[in-house]
Amino acid sequence: TLAALGGAIYAGPVKKAAEFEAQMSTVKAISNASADDMKRLSEEAKHMGATTKFTAVEAGKALEYMAMAGWKTDQMLGGLPGIMNLAAASGEDLGQVSDIVTDALTAFNMTADQSGRFADVLAQASSNANTNVSMMGATFQKVAPVAGALGYSVEDMSLGIGLMAN
């Protein structure tokens, strides 16, 4: 009936708004961000949801992984575009890509402001080898802590992983 159709039309946006609020509550709980910082993070997630192929909820999930890595608000805001570009280019899940990038940056003693560089290196390596971002991320998970401690660069490791994948 018309009432049921109207309810269904109204329920969709309400559910999405509730999902977004729940996701951002998770970010707040992990990051312990102030109300002002949460406003900035929420606005950026909504902006990314409106201007990229990803939803605001997915952008919030990426922020969650950044918060788990100990990134502060400005680091999250600075790192989000590069991570989103890598996820878009690879066609992979944004949250998973954020997890890969934040974990690898930590292992290589790189800072959040280097996430764009790391994302570019990973995108290039995965597109030039018989691998993808997820497989490279799984490999980085195993080798990055040792490689980083030994002073190897992300570029060296990406090249090595790409060669082994071929």
Write out the residue ranges for each language-model feature.
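Small-residue helix-packing and pore-constriction motifs in hydrophobic alpha-helices
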Residues: 2-50, 61-69, 76-90, 96-129, ...
